[in-house]
Amino acid sequence: MENAKMNSLIAQYPLVEDLVALKETTWFNPGTTSLAEGLPYVGLTEQDVQDAHARLSRFAPYLAKAFPETAAAGGIIESELVAIPAMQKRLEKEYQQPIAGQLLLKKDSHLPISGSIKARGGIYEVLAHAEKLALEAGLLTLEDDYSKLLSPEFKQFFSQYSIAVGSTGNLGLSIGIMSARIGFKVTVHMSADARAWKKAKLRSHGVTVVEYEQDYGVAVEEGRKAAQSDPNCFFIDDENSRTLFLGYSVAGQRLKAQFAQQGRIVDADNPLFVYLPCGVGGGPGGVAFGLKLAFGDHVHCFFAEPTHSPCMLLGVHTGLHDQISVQDIGIDNLTAADGLAVGRASGFVGRAMERLLDGFYTLSDQTMYDMLGWLAQEEGIRLEPSALAGMAGSQRVCASVSYQQMHGFSAEQLRNATHLVWATGGGMVPEEEMNQYLAKGR
């Protein structure tokens, strides 16, 4: 971006200067509305989420047999919700900032099949596509036991079709593993940030991995192009897919059930704050949408991004969405948080969700490494750097009197609050790699 344009952008949005300087930044969204007001802009409804829920239930018998690690849960792909009191104390000590309320961790990092939040959306979209093809071919009815999809006849049928996706790693992992198991031919277009072990794991499942020297945006674009030339190839579009988004959104009702099981209350007197790591935006956007439908105006969602890849904060704050990238303002999009290394946010997610998000913040790679180490020491839970992005959120909220006043939170409401950190990945990181992460923490 030329200097004059840049200066006028900074004049209009002074916060951009902090982003350019790679400062850890917090922006509380003044445009937040009620659910009733914000919902029409999403373009999806509660019924759409119920349909996704029903589809996953139809596939449960299949998943239980195809992936034995899901059998105990009856073929439902869901993660644990745990309290992390020792980590809460550690954060208070390190930052000299009390955290009012209770700190919890949602362990999507340990979801079965692919060990990340992408096991929600990625697997769901592959299943939705497989179901559509099988129904259209007259091989399946909605009343069938879907475990019949494991038969050689279905494998043969699906092998005529292929799936393509562009990814920094975790989405490719979930879509690759699921597609290969069903019988699709699958190609994952991986950006320069993708970890070697993720590529190796995909190849071990018979997935074709195409590697790029450039970032995520290029991998997605090339994947899209390759798919266009083949009528039997289905491209899963991380930037614009409503199906992916709905796969993530099912998490809202599931979390509500987990809260009920644990006797946790969410209402006006007991607010819920949720901190979601954000790359292109589909995962956190879909989850936040589901949470809003489940908990209404009593849940407050925040997106967390690396200082080197603040694409969603930049897009929503300036109102330019996918018309601006972090590279346009001179930021390099290079971060250890490979899952979040995205320079241009999803325009669909930004426009759909901007009224339903309470805020956005950035944190440095070093901060993620530090918290990764503390969590391993205090709670014995090991995550990848991206998954720690949400861990800084409770601090930012508890330290901001202006945010608390904007929403009229009393001291008592904050004492009764639940702070939920959404851990997005790390359950499948090889030990050697994990030890390298741990060595970087202070």
Swiss-Prot record:
<dbReference type="GO" id="GO:0009097">
    <property type="term" value="P:isoleucine biosynthetic process"/>
</dbReference>
<dbReference type="InterPro" id="IPR050147">
    <property type="entry name" value="Ser/Thr_Dehydratase"/>
</dbReference>
<dbReference type="InterPro" id="IPR000634">
    <property type="entry name" value="Ser/Thr_deHydtase_PyrdxlP-BS"/>
</dbReference>
<dbReference type="GO" id="GO:0008721">
    <property type="term" value="F:D-serine ammonia-lyase activity"/>
</dbReference>
<dbReference type="GO" id="GO:0016836">
    <property type="term" value="F:hydro-lyase activity"/>
</dbReference>
<protein>
    <recommendedName>
        <fullName>D-serine dehydratase</fullName>
        <ecNumber>4.3.1.18</ecNumber>
    </recommendedName>
</protein>
<comment type="similarity">
    <text>Belongs to the serine/threonine dehydratase family. DsdA subfamily.</text>
</comment>
<keyword id="KW-0663">Pyridoxal phosphate</keyword>
<dbReference type="InterPro" id="IPR036052">
    <property type="entry name" value="TrpB-like_PALP_sf"/>
</dbReference>
<dbReference type="InterPro" id="IPR001926">
    <property type="entry name" value="TrpB-like_PALP"/>
</dbReference>
<dbReference type="Pfam" id="PF00291">
    <property type="entry name" value="PALP"/>
</dbReference>
<feature type="modified residue" description="N6-(pyridoxal phosphate)lysine">
    <location>
        <position position="118"/>
    </location>
</feature>
<dbReference type="InterPro" id="IPR011780">
    <property type="entry name" value="D_Ser_am_lyase"/>
</dbReference>
<dbReference type="GO" id="GO:0036088">
    <property type="term" value="P:D-serine catabolic process"/>
</dbReference>
<keyword id="KW-0456">Lyase</keyword>
<comment type="subunit">
    <text>Monomer.</text>
</comment>
<dbReference type="GO" id="GO:0030170">
    <property type="term" value="F:pyridoxal phosphate binding"/>
</dbReference>
